[in-house]
Amino acid sequence: MAEKAPPGLNRKTSRSTLSLPPEPVDIIRSKTCSRRVKINVGGLNHEVLWRTPDRLPRTRLGKLRDCNTHESLLEVCDDYNLGHNEYFFDRHPGAFTSILNFYRTGKLHMMEEMCALSVGQELDYWGIDEIYLESCCQARYHQKKEQMNEELRREAETMRDGEGEEFDNTCCPEKRKKSRDLLEKPNSSVAAKILAIVSNLFIVLSTIALSLNTLPELQEMDEFGQPNDNPQLAHVEAVCNAWFTMEYLLRFLSSPNKWKFFKGPLNVIDLLAILPYYVTIFLTESNKSVLQFQNVRRVVQIFRIMRILRILKLARHSTGLQSLGFTLRRSYNELGLLILFLAMGIMIFSSLVFFAEKDADATKFTSIPASFWWATITMTTVGYGDIYPKTLLGKSVGGLCCIAGVLVIALPIPIIVPPFSEFYKEQKRQEKAIKRREALERAKRNGSIVSMNLKDAFARSMELIDVAVEKAGESSSTKDSADDNHLSPSRWKWARKALSETSSNKSYENKYQEVSQKDSHEQLNNTSSSSPQHLSAQKLEMLYNEITKTQPHPAPNPDGQEQPDRPSAYEEEIEMEEVVCPQEQLAVAQGEVIVDMKSTSSIDSFTSCATDFTETERSPLPPLSASHLQMRFPPDLAGTDEHQRARGPPFLMLARGKGPAGRDAILEYAPVDITVSLDASGSKVGSHGPLQPDSASESPKSSLKGSNPLKSRSLRVNFKENRGSAPQTPPSTARPLPVTTADFSLTAPQLISTILLEETPSQGDRPLLGAEGSAHCQGPSKGLSPRFPKQKLFPFSSRERRSFTEIDT
């Protein structure tokens, strides 16, 4: 996990600027410095040798060794910490134990307590194929996986059936939905339960009436001498059939999908239970004559028998009957196998018993088809006794037929019973799940519960923050909080997007100088309150709405136009480090403490300076030997084209908005043994009078850093007008102390003294011109030049910015 250094702590890391991702060289150095690597999976730390993940280079851990950029690392892991050589994966820690053991031993086993589906997901994430599972775990894994897939498939079908029944595009959707729940879901309400009970009573009543109509005592003879239904029972039959018809029509009208309604098995049963009654009435009323009635009598009897199918309507409200139907549909392969075994046995034993009994006296086995009945009742162990063998050979065949029947029937039963039990339990579980889901839906509609996935909430919060930053990116940008992770992937995606939207010539320092226009205290408060870890969805939406309503502030004007006044109560602490020179120490106030600059090296920590700091600790400066600072005034810069100026040597341009000297002063590097200073009025002072324009010589180290786009950034220093005069702070030899811009604002600017800081030779970087504190510049001589008898201080810019000074390195 990439951590931020605490304030005041100077950590010797590969990159001290926390607002930038680590460079590939730093990542490679971190990996090569240690033979071991720390892998943090879900908070559980594992420490292994680098050669362990290298054994499987195509897996996720194997690719970790080859990732040398920030983006590639975040594609493999979720977070990392180069300082501790630690890589974080937000995955199940228990499953990773088995996976890491596979890297070490080459044996992959599945943990007993883990779900098969979860194990499969973990194997897919780490890039390991399930074929590497050992034989002792493969059977259990595939059995559980098949079971889980079947349950998920059934649940998906149930959910799809429920989701497919939408009423949005139909007429009166609310009323139709309520009527459908009333007729199809008995557990949805009390009225639905009452309606289901009444429907079941009509089914039972019609079945009883159908049975009583067959009693001779209750039948009546018609004019042709044929028995007819009892009139009272006929009225009961008519009422029951009217109820069934009304129920079927209401169910059809409330159904969103008519074709799906007709194909439903329970609806087909309802239709077959209703049609025979109307067909019987039509046939009997349309054929009044004796001859016609005799022709349709048998057809009418068949349709009357079909009324018994009404008993199957009970399956609509019975989970057990639905389980039986599901078992028959699911086990049709096993049932077909059972019927095939029985058919083969019947054919074999009926043929054997026929040839064994055909010569016996008064035998009943007259043919093989006549022997089918005996083989069937014998194999099913029924044995009516109406037909049986009499010879010894025939009895032997009968014994073998009984044994074969027991084996044939008993073997498929264990295959058929478990699906019935499982489906019954599954139906009960689904009923409870449906109730729970409906309760959650009602709670969500009422606003009493908010269901949100944590990862979805975090991703949504990050999207809202990115949109908010883009909306306000024209004028200001919030500073990174000290508690937030600076290696957040979404943050770098936004940074890349911001760079791509700008021009190709817009460098990193220009972006950061725009960011630094906002008050640092205000940024800290906003960032701490808008961190995605501490915001709910409502607060994020409010934040987005507020930011989109705010008007963008005007950007800094490089032409020297006056910026809007900022509040006077603005104070910013600048952390500095002691710079020791042979002649004289830095002039700072007594009673203050200096903190290491690298602890707050972010660009956003102060508003007036934008610079880059080196990775190594700063050391006291030796006497300048290579390059020195020289100031010259060209004859006329007003007519010079800006494009031609940009092509000139590196210079420091001092544009004064007000004052007697309104010219542009150019500071350039030249091997001249002089020191340049500027008095309070802006006049130039030098050892040779007005400086002549000459060619500037650059330090040999300056070319080493130009190849790095992240380090070749310009330095901007904003100066402020005089606010009065104050006594000069005497130089102090005590330890450096913190200096604030509020203290400088009370001091009259009298002298600009700059110093050229050199980095350590091991870094190979050219020296940077430090502008974060008051300093002085010395030549190669041991003492100060007599032309400059005094050291004067110049304050840093605060809320007002009058001019801009730029050093292009």
Swiss-Prot record:
Biased composition (Polar residues): 523-534, 694-711
Modification after translation (UniProt): Phosphorylated. Phosphorylation at Ser-608 of the FFAT motif activates interaction with MOSPD2, VAPA and VAPB.
Transmembrane segments: 191-212, 233-254, 266-284, 297-317, 333-354, 396-424
Domain of life of the native organism: Eukaryota
Extracellular-side positions: 213-232, 285-296, 355-368, 389-395
Motif (Selectivity filter): 381-386
Basic and acidic residues compositional bias, start-end: 508-522, 798-809
InterPro entries: BTB/POZ_dom (IPR000210), Ion_trans_dom (IPR005821), K_chnl_volt-dep_Kv (IPR003968), K_chnl_volt-dep_Kv2 (IPR003973), K_chnl_volt-dep_Kv2.2 (IPR005826), SKP1/BTB/POZ_sf (IPR011333), T1-type_BTB (IPR003131), VG_K_chnl (IPR028325)
Regulation acting on activity, per entry: Inhibited by quinine at micromolar levels. Modestly sensitive to millimolar levels of tetraethylammonium (TEA) and 4-aminopyridine (4-AP).
Ranges facing Cytoplasmic side: 1-190, 255-265, 318-332, 425-809
Carbohydrate attachment residues: 287
Membrane topology qualifier: Multi-pass membrane protein
Protein keywords: Cell membrane, Cell projection, Glycoprotein, Ion channel, Ion transport, Membrane, Phosphoprotein, Potassium, Potassium channel, Potassium transport, Transmembrane, Transmembrane helix, Transport, Voltage-gated channel
Distribution of this protein across tissues and organs: Expressed in smooth muscle cells.
Assembly information from the UniProt record: Homotetramer or heterotetramer with KCNB1. Heterotetramer with KCNS1 and KCNS2. Interacts (via phosphorylated FFAT motif) with VAPA and VAPB.
Family recorded in the similarity comment: Belongs to the potassium channel family. B (Shab) (TC 1.A.1.2) subfamily. Kv2.2/KCNB2 sub-subfamily.
Name of this protein: Potassium voltage-gated channel subfamily B member 2
